[in-house]
Amino acid sequence: KRGLIKDIERNYHVRIKKQVSFIRDWIFLCFFLGNDFLPHLKSLDIYHNGIHLLLSVYCFFIKKTKQYDNDYLILPNQDINMSLLRKIFNRLHKNEENYIIENIKHHKYKRNYLDDIPIRYCYKGWSNRYYDYYYKTHSFLYIDKIVENYFRTLIWTKEYYFKGCPCWKHYYKYKGILLSDMKE
């Protein structure tokens, strides 16, 4: 734990004042890179810069605060600081297409990335093609259902890791989603 915090302080030029709060946030941030319950966000890949991207943006915002309890992603009552999460998503979203293209270049010979060829990420309208390809629709109502299920599963996963399993019947039903849909 101390080694992780020292590395992050050194590499991201940030001073972590509340180590327990930071560790909770670190665990929570890693959910976006995928785990047994949630797929990774399409633009974030744990094998190619995903951790660095998340930490860079997270530390950018943490540096701007006094690091009071309510300045962290996971609040003392274990709720999610939606204001900070929204800021993180908005900042990451600005370069989402570039992150995806870099991930594809990095994984250009791996089957799951080759499946994405019809989406043509470099061309306008790629996010609609993404949903058309994987879900056969790009209806906002359907995408809202996907985002809602993602957030419910995100909260479920947070509860599972921090408090214990809230319900064994819950699961995430879809493929990874785009930051552009999460930022709202």
Go through each PLM region and give its residues.
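Long, low-complexity, charge-dense
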Residues: 1-184
